[in-house]
């Protein structure tokens, strides 16, 4: 972790535009289990470099959690955030979360759609999907600020990058269709 930290600080000093940090929960070779937490450690220690998650494995989380965490990171970094997302990476991570046989591509699409609806919408929230549901109605009290999700610093949202394994993959077509960057 110290070596990765120093590499990103040095890259910032050299004028690099972006630093990308992956997410793996079940490998000693890449022990960064949360790119957002790791990169938050670097915000105050860098000047201009943008931070990209390479990638947040969306099927492993409820979309509302990622909407909140990503919006917070975007604020902390004052817009130096690129949200890289994907359907996952390592089979032991899939096994850990019980999603080995799940349609992770479809889970990813539903998740990012739900995240964007949260960021674009106003409470009360009722968003239904095949894999997740988000609902805040009974406890939406606007004058107290209850039931309101944080919006990102960048408007309408941080740039989105989507992992792709090959030039003909379904994720690269999705990235092109939605004007997202492939990574």
Could you describe each region identified by the protein language model?
Residues 24, 54-56, 86-88:
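Histidine-centered beta-alpha loop that forms part of the nucleotide-sugar donor binding/catalytic region
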Residues 18, 48-55, 80-84, 159-161, ...:
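Structural preference for beta-strand elements that scaffold enzyme active sites
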Residues 62-178:
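Internal, glycine-rich beta/alpha segment that forms the wall or movable "lid"
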Residues 1-16, 82-84, 102, 116, ...:
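C-terminal amphipathic alpha-helical "assembly" element
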Residues 30, 54, 58, 147, ...:
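Residue-level detector of alpha-helical hydrophobic segments embedded in or interacting with membranes
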Residues 1-53, 157-158:
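N-terminal beta1-alpha1-beta2 module of alpha/beta enzyme domains
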Residues 27-32, 56-62, 100-101:
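Glycine-rich "substrate-gating" loop/helix at the edge of Rossmann-like oxidoreductase active sites
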Residues 23, 54, 96-100:
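Short amphipathic alpha-helical segments at helix-loop
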